[in-house]
Amino acid sequence: NSFKAKDVIGIGEFTEVSLLQRGTVFDARLAYDVELEINGVKGEWLLDSGAMGFTIGNIMFERLISSGVSYKDLNKTVKSFGIGGEAYGDLVVLEEVKIGDYVVKNVVATVLDTPTSLLGTGFLLKFSNVVWNMKEKTLLLYK
């Protein structure tokens, strides 16, 4: 994924996206989810600033497939590393992903055999700029 102005469709200079907080700093489980929509199927992705990719967990992928979401299989398996160890996944291209008031076209995703879907910096590279406001629990995504 990389910045291409024509891939981000919507009105306005930016869209503000609410972050859904999970846990607290006191229980060492502070995390944020972001709501996305892929061809009408809504889901939550864990915002992972340490992840390069945009991943779809197996549970979400099954929901997408059963809802008839089309995708392009790139016929490439990749290996990823993270806090949970290593995992293998298949690269696909999604026609469009809705986040906030924007629709993002041509999103490369890795389908993993794990339950969690991650929104990493790879997806955020589709925008010209991203501002993470931790106090307000928002992301500002700029065209």
Stretch-by-stretch model annotation:
Residues N1-K143:
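Pepsin/retropepsin-fold aspartyl endopeptidases
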